[in-house]
Amino acid sequence: RKRGLGVLRSIKELYCHYFVFGQTLIDKVAMKAGLEKQYNYQFDNYERFLEILNSGQGVVMIGAHVGCWEAGAGFFGAYGKKINIVMLDAEHQQIKDVIEGNAKEEKNYNVIPLNQNIIDAMLQMKVALNNGEYICFTGDRFIGTDNTILIDFLGSKALFPKGLFQIAAKCRVPVVFYYSMR
């Protein structure tokens, strides 16, 4: 209704959404099964992205809950030892259990859980960035609205977290936006 679509068009859009979500789940299983070489990859601004990753400095990477981040695993294999994923503590344990239970090899990333001790998480992020590592966030998820900014996004107002950019600015590291889609 928010998009002003009729009933039939809304049903079609919902079906397409579920279809793409199903493809994403299949991609996740395929990546965990070691089939990443069966996929073809296409990148936007690939040379600039590699230039930033190879610079030796820390990088803040911002993704979204869209597509399948595991689809990028083939690309990030060489860079994986330097990846730190920042996530909510409750999700951390659930995701850790799923990944460790299904992974065919050892994980190639570190998780920085956000919990009641936000200072500890911030210090871990600072250490990682100072060591030339990458910290990855999902930019479409935040707690509360105190540290957000309201901007126009795809024709509507949307809240986005400011903290990700503040961390990058304070640590003087570049920000890279990343997503992978089928």
Residue spans for each PLM region:
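Short, flexible segments with low predicted structural confidence
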Residues: 23-24, 100, 139-140
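Short, conserved clusters of charged catalytic residues that mark active-site
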Residues: 44, 120-121, 159-163
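Flexible, active-site-adjacent loop/turn segments at secondary-structure boundaries
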Residues: 39-41, 47, 64, 148-152, ...
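Short acidic active-site motifs
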Residues: 48, 120-125
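Alpha-helical segments flanking ligand/cofactor-binding loops in enzyme cores
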Residues: 50, 74, 126, 165-166
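Membrane-associated lipid acylation/remodeling enzymes share a hydrophobic transmembrane-juxtamembrane segment
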Residues: 81-84, 127-182
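Membrane-proximal helical "anchor" segments flanking the first transmembrane region
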Residues: 1-60, 67
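Catalytic core of membrane glycerolipid acyltransferases/transacylases, capturing the structured
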Residues: 6-9, 13-16, 55-116, 131, ...
